[in-house]
A protein has these predicted regions:
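Short S/T/G/P-rich N-terminal loop/turn motif that feeds into the first structured element of a domain
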Residues: 1-206
Length: 206
């Protein structure tokens, strides 16, 4: 998937017995968004760690927010979305919009099996410095198997202004190797002097 400018993240609690059905329905819903709202891609997965462990997350990628506006119009008329909501087994409790800034990371077209979402607090005046650190360490992600990387700022929610890094991986082993190398990198150490990580979750793509 190519670079995009906006990422939409929606989190829901879902009855375990309904997950297989919801995964099937979300596949159909995703196709509708790509075909008719201009979504550049979607991801659907289960959050395995952190405060939202056990919840499901739906991630959408857009070039502009006009696409997301179209997505909301489709949502209001979608029989698939209505079926999910009418089931009484899924409850959306979080939806945030994040920017996605250009980075030096070359995106792969291969679909990841895992995504690591990291949220950090830092001053807006440190945005360029933060982005430089991400670009300086981009090879650490790529060399250890990372497939996709998105970095930006949250525009909505209780953590507005926080920075969000989402990285897609083919395996848990690739995640482990990446962080082993990152911890020893000077730019990562610099990053930790002005940014405070307040969330890191691992998502398994369904």
């Amino acid at each position: 998937m190519s670079n995009t400018n906006y990422v939409i993240l929606t989190v829901a609690s879902v009855d375990f017995s309904y997950r297989e059905t919801m995964a099937r329905l979300m596949s159909s819903y995703s196709k509708d968004l790509i075909d008719n709202a201009g979504a550049k891609g979607t991801r659907f997965g289960s959050i395995g760690t952190g405060d939202h462990a056990g919840s499901l997350i739906f991630i959408q990628f857009y070039d502009d927010l006009t696409g997301y506006q179209k997505a909301l119009e489709i949502q209001s008329k979608s029989s698939v979305f209505k079926e999910i909501m009418d089931s009484g087994k899924a409850n959306i409790y979080l939806r945030n919009i994040s920017t996605s800034l250009p980075t030096k990371f070359e995106q792969s077209s291969e679909h990841p099996k895992y995504i690591v979402l990291t949220r950090a607090e830092a001053a807006m005046s440190d945005k360029d410095k933060f982005l430089n650190c991400i670009n300086d360490t981009a090879f650490c992600f790529k060399d250890n198997g990372a497939l996709t990387l998105r970095f930006g700022n949250l525009l909505t929610g209780s953590n507005v202004g926080n920075y969000l890094l989402g990285v897609g991986y083919p395996s848990m082993e690739a995640i482990e190797k990446t962080y082993d190398q990152l911890l020893a990198h000077s730019s990562y150490k610099e990053l930790m002097t002005f940014a405070k990580v307040n969330m890191r979750n691992i998502i398994k793509i369904l």
